[in-house]
Amino acid sequence: EEGSSIVKFYEKLPAEQGEHRQDFILEKKSYETRFRMIVVGDPQVKSMASLERFKNETITAINETIGKSGNLPCYIISTGDNFESNHHDDGLYLANVKEVMGGTLCPFFVINGNHDKDAGKGDAATEHKDCFGPMNYSFNIGGAHFVCLDNIRFSNDTDYSTGFTDAQIEWLEQDLKTVSTSRILVLIMHAPLRSNFTNKDAFWSLLQSFGEVHIFAGHTHDNENVTLKTPKEIYQHVHGTACGAWWKSDICADGTPNGY
C-alpha cells in the first residue's frame, strides 16, 4: 500500500451485486536467485503497551536485520495471531497495528490466526479481511512459490480445529496446476499440521509431485522443526513468537527469545 510496506495485491469487491471491473498494473521484476524471508509468529498485540513493544523491539530488530542484508532482497510474513482476541473487531486498533507493521523496510505479507477471528460470526474473519485482504493467496519469489492458507476452522464461539475446507482444496489444486514442480513450494499457515486435520489426504496428495516442500507455521509460542511423512517428507518450521509468553517477558514458552 502507498506509504506502507504491507503488500496490497487485491481490490475489494463492492457490496452490490452485478458486474465489476478492477484493473491491475503488473510490473515485471528481475529474477531473484537469492532472497531473505523473515517470518514473524504471533505478534498477538493486546494493548497499546504491547503495541509499543512490538514496534520498538520486533519491528526495530527486523529493520536492523534488513539494513544489514545489503543488496539481498528481503520479505516478511506474519503467521497470524496479529491481535489478541478482544481486539479482532476493533477497526481503529487493527489500523494501528497495521501501521506499525507497515513501518518495515521491505514488503510485508500477512495471514490470520485463531485470535484474529470472531468465532461467533458466520464469516469469522470479516474485520481481518477488511484490514489485510484475502485469507488464501499465493505469490512467487525467485524459484519459490509461496501459498498462504487459513487453516483455522471454528465450530462454535470457542472451539476450533485445524484443516482446510473443500473450497480451499479446490482452490489450492487450481493454483498448483500453474506452478512448475521444480519450484520450491512453501505453504504458510497459522497452526502447525499434526497427524489429523480436516481434508488431510486431499491436502497431502496435492504436494507429492513437488521436489521440495516446506511448511511455515506459528501458534504454539515455541520453536520446533520437524519432518512430516506424508508419505513424502515435508519439513515443517514452527516459528517462535514476537510476543513470546504473551508480552509478559522477553522469552517464548520454551525459553527461546522473543523475535522472528
What is each residue range found by the language model?
Residues 74, 185, 213:
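Conserved acidic residues
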Residues 176-195:
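Short acidic, glycine-rich surface-loop motifs adjacent to enzyme active sites
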Residues 42, 76, 81, 113, ...:
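Divalent metal-coordination and catalytic microenvironments
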Residues 3-111, 117-135, 202:
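Divalent metal-dependent phosphoesterase catalytic cores across multiple superfamilies
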Residues 44, 82-83, 115-116, 192-193, ...:
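Catalytic metal-binding/acid-base residues of hydrolase active sites
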Residues 87-179, 199-214, 225-260:
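Extended active-site neighborhood of metal-dependent phosphoesterases/phosphodiesterases
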Residues 34-47, 143-153, 186-188, 236-240:
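Active-site-proximal beta-strand elements of phosphoester/diester hydrolases
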Residues 43-50, 79-88, 151-165, 191-194:
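The substrate-binding groove and active-site-proximal loops of carbohydrate-active enzymes
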